[in-house]
């Protein structure tokens, strides 16, 4: 039985659920979950939670992500990426656009921006996923959503090929950002139909691509009983939360039993959520929140045994 977080390199062609399914067979355990869907055609780091670490998956998903994305100007598609049918084309050559113009437009997308999620996505409208409407050739109004782009900049030269223009960007963003929609919107700002032609996630929830393991590597490590050495502790997935050190053994016992407390037990005023940590082992004991109906009280959200 494993308890911890494992950064997995998801290969192209696999769904996030495929990764979980394969790991359940290899590790012979059911309590495994991923931390946010990566589309099949996207590769990169996918943090996987094992055992008790599944309790912190929501918090890992809230952390930032970084991508390398190839943007192609000159063609738009039904899915906003390279897998869709072509919607519109417009020839692009060196006289139409330059690197300075592209860089100036990219800067306009930093900060909080509005996005309309793509039709081929799992966003729900009226109880149905958008891709269900798309597959039935139905139209539906898609609500705008605010997302956060911490940084976006170009990391390649601008190249021209077969009446299209290509350049790669690095994007650091918050939860819920659609990079293919970002690519399409960048194209619109530049005056051309566009789509995302390749995507790799290089960081997610504090985990880097360089430290990610392939499924084959995980299998080999498990068979040699050395996978434990590659696991990140549960605490790593909660590093963005305020923590309180607990020394008193009776207080520790009450926390582990899931008791509620008056806020005065805390050394300072907090907003939700926060964690109690065993001062001797530095292991997280529980995640607590302010009681929604009793603002003077704190209650457990997740307890770790």
UniProtKB/Swiss-Prot annotation:
Gene3D superfamilies: Pseudouridine synthase (3.30.2350.10). It holds the Pfam family TruB_N. Its EC number is 5.4.99.25. The keyword Isomerase applies. CDD domains: PseudoU_synth_EcTruB. It catalyses: uridine(55) in tRNA = pseudouridine(55) in tRNA. The active site is at residue 39. One of its GO terms (molecular function) is RNA binding. One of its GO terms (biological process) is mRNA pseudouridine synthesis. Responsible for synthesis of pseudouridine from uracil-55 in the psi GC loop of transfer RNAs. Belongs to the pseudouridine synthase TruB family. Type 1 subfamily. This is tRNA pseudouridine synthase B. It comes from Staphylococcus epidermidis (strain ATCC 35984 / DSM 28319 / BCRC 17069 / CCUG 31568 / BM 3577 / RP62A).
